[in-house]
Swiss-Prot record:
Sites of N6,N6,N6-trimethyllysine modification: K5
Location of the active site: K166 (proton acceptor), H285 (proton acceptor)
Protein name as it appears in the record: Ribulose bisphosphate carboxylase large chain
Gene3D superfamilies: Ribulose bisphosphate carboxylase, large subunit, C-terminal domain (3.20.20.110), RuBisCO large subunit, N-terminal domain (3.30.70.150)
Complex and partners: Heterohexadecamer of 8 large chains and 8 small chains; disulfide-linked. The disulfide link is formed within the large subunit homodimers.
Modified residues (N6-carboxylysine): K192
Additional remarks: The basic functional RuBisCO is composed of a large chain homodimer in a 'head-to-tail' conformation. In form I RuBisCO this homodimer is arranged in a barrel-like tetramer with the small subunits forming a tetrameric 'cap' on each end of the 'barrel'.
Species the sequence originates in: Oxalis dillenii (Gray-green wood sorrel)
Length: 466
C-alpha cells in the first residue's frame, strides 16, 4: 500500500482550524469571500487559506516530505458580512516562514498571487493584512519619514502645499519649468510631475529635470524657503529609473517620484533604498490603484496597498481627498491615513481596520490629498488631514484667473488663514467659509480664486462602503 491516501479531499479537513490561536509572528489576512452557490463558508475559507499557502487541488506524496502543520495557512475564523447574505469575512493566518524577508513582491505573490482566479469562490477581496513586527523589521520602509522630511525642508506646524503641473502632457521642458517656477515663487512648497509624465517625445526626462532644477533654485533664492519638484523617475526598466534618480541627485534637488503600482514593488523598493542612501525624498503616486481596489467584492482594498507601500518605501503617497473629485469615504480614508502615519493603530471596524497594527519604528508616510480640490476646500482639508499631510491643488492652482503665481498665493494664504484660525481655537468645520472670506479681504489673489470656484462641487455617491 502507498504511504499516503491519494485523491481529492475537502480543504476544510486540513485548512479550517477554528481552535487555532494566532501567533504574534503570523501574518493575518481578512478576505471578503463570495463563494459559488452550494459551497459552505468553511470550505471556501479553507480553500482560500490552502491556495494562498501550501495547498494544491489533490493530495501529493511530497506532502510527506515536509511538515504541513508548520507551513500551512489556516482559516481560523469566519464571520458574516452585515446586509450581505452571500458574503462572509474569512480570517487566515500565515506562518512567517512562508515569506521572503524584505520582499513585498513575495508577500503579495503568496497571499494574492493565485487564489483570486480560484473556482470555488465567485469573488474575493483582501480587506486588510496584519503585518507582524517580526516581518516589518526586515524592511527599510520609507526613505526618511515625516519628521526627517520636516527637518530637511524646515517646515513645521502646517500641512505642505503641492501642485501638479497641467496640462499634464504636451508642454515643452522650458515652458514646464516656467510653470514650476511660478507656482513655487507664489508660495507652494512643491510642484509635481503628473504620473504619466515619464520621457515622451515632446519632453525628454533630462531636459525636464534641468529646467525644473533651475526653477527650484531660482524660487528658493527669491522666497528664502526650501522648494521641491517631484521629478518622476518612473521608467521602462529599473536601470533607467535609477539612472534618472542619480541625475536628480547630481542636480541637488530634494525629491523624486515613482508610480509604485505600475512600476512594481521590486522597482519601488530598489528606488526607496537608493533614496535613503542618497538623501532624496520619495513621492509615491498610486496610478492603477482603482483597477485593484475599486470593486467592493473583488480585488484588494487600498489600505492593503498603503501598508505595502509603507513597507516597500515612500515618503508621500496619494490617498484620496474626502472632498473634491476623487472622493473617498471619510472614516475609511482616515483609517488608512492613520495606518500610513502612526506607529500603532488599534483595530476599529467602523474605520475598516480589521487588525491592530504595530509598526514599531518604521518611519511614517505623509498622505497626499489631491484631485479636484480648491481654496474653498482648505478648511475641511486642514481639519480632516491635520498638519502631517500634503495638500495638492493642480487645477486649483493653475486655474486661478490671474495665472499660476497668484493661484499659488491664493492657496498659501488660504492655508495660513486656516492654520491660524485653528490655532486660535476656531472650529474649521463650522466656520470654514467665513475664515476664507475674511482672509480674501486682505488678499486679492485669494478673492479672485474664491470667485471662480464658489459653486464648484463634484458630488457622487461614494463607491466604497463598509
Amino acid at each position: 500500500s502507498v504511504g499516503f491516501k491519494a485523491g481529492v479531499k475537502d480543504y476544510k479537513l486540513t485548512y479550517y482550524t477554528p481552535e487555532y490561536e494566532t501567533k504574534d509572528t503570523d501574518i493575518l489576512a481578512a478576505f471578503r469571500v463570495t463563494p459559488q452557490p452550494g459551497v459552505p463558508p468553511e470550505e471556501a475559507g479553507a480553500a482560500v487559506a490552502a491556495e494562498s499557502s501550501t495547498g494544491t487541488w489533490t493530495t501529493v506524496w511530497t506532502d510527506g516530505l515536509t511538515s504541513l502543520d508548520r507551513y500551512k495557512g489556516r482559516c481560523y475564523h469566519i464571520e458574516p458580512v452585515p446586509g450581505e447574505e452571500s458574503q462572509f469575512i474569512a480570517y487566515v493566518a500565515y506562518p512567517l516562514d512562508l515569506f521572503e524577508e524584505g520582499s513585498v513582491t513575495n508577500m503579495f505573490t503568496s497571499i494574492v498571487g493565485n487564489v483570486f482566479g480560484f473556482n470555488a469562490v465567485r469573488a474575493l477581496r483582501l480587506e486588510d493584512l496584519r503585518i507582524p513586527p517580526a516581518y516589518t523589521k526586515t524592511f527599510q520602509g520609507p526613505p526618511h519619514g515625516i519628521q526627517v522630511e520636516r527637518d530637511k525642508l524646515n517646515k513645521y506646524g502646517r500641512p505642505l502645499l503641492g501642485c501638479t503641473i497641467k496640462p499634464k502632457l504636451g508642454l515643452s521642458a522650458k515652458n514646464y519649468g516656467r510653470a514650476v517656477y511660478e507656482c513655487l515663487r507664489g508660495g507652494l512648497d512643491f510642484t509635481k510631475d503628473d504620473e504619466n509624465v515619464n520621457s515622451q517625445p515632446f519632453m525628454r526626462w533630462r531636459d525636464r529635470f534641468l529646467f525644473c532644477a533651475e526653477a527650484i533654485f531660482k524660487s528658493q533664492s527669491e522666497t528664502g524657503e526650501i522648494k521641491g519638484h517631484y521629478l518622476n523617475a518612473t521608467a521602462g526598466t529599473c536601470e533607467e529609473m535609477i539612472k534618472r534618480a542619480v541625475f536628480a541627485r547630481e542636480l541637488g534637488v530634494p525629491i523624486v517620484m515613482h508610480d509604485y503600482l505600475t512600476g512594481g514593488f521590486t522597482a519601488n523598493t530598489s528606488l526607496a533604498h537608493y533614496c535613503r542612501d542618497n538623501g532624496l525624498l520619495l513621492h509615491i503616486h498610486r496610478a492603477m490603484h482603482a483597477v485593484i481596489d475599486r470593486q467592493k467584492n473583488h480585488g484588494x482594498h487600498f489600505r492593503v496597498l498603503a501598508k505595502a507601500l509603507r513597507m516597500s518605501g515612500g515618503d508621500h503617497i496619494h490617498s484620496g481627498t474626502v472632498v473634491g473629485k476623487l472622493e473617498g469615504e471619510r472614516e475609511i480614508t482616515l483609517g488608512f491615513v492613520d495606518l500610513l502615519r502612526d506607529d500603532f493603530v488599534e483595530k476599529d471596524r467602523s474605520r475598516g481596520i480589521f487588525f491592530t497594527q504595530d509598526w514599531v519604528s518604521l518611519p511614517g508616510v505623509l498622505p497626499v490629498a489631491s484631485g479636484g480640490i480648491h481654496v474653498w476646500h482648505m478648511p475641511a482639508l486642514t481639519e480632516i488631514f491635520g498638519d502631517d499631510s500634503v495638500l495638492q491643488f493642480g487645477g486649483g492652482t493653475l486655474g486661478x484667473p490671474w495665472g499660476n503665481x497668484p493661484g499659488a498665493v491664493a492657496n498659501r494664504v488660504a492655508l495660513e488663514a486656516c492654520v491660524q484660525a485653528r490655532n486660535e481655537g476656531r472650529d474649521l468645520a463650522r466656520e470654514g467659509n467665513e475664515i476664507i472670506r475674511e482672509a480674501s479681504k486682505w488678499s486679492p489673489e485669494l478673492a479672485a480664486a474664491c470667485e471662480v470656484w464658489k459653486e464648484i462641487k463634484f458630488e457622487f455617491e461614494p463607491v466604497d462602503t463598509i
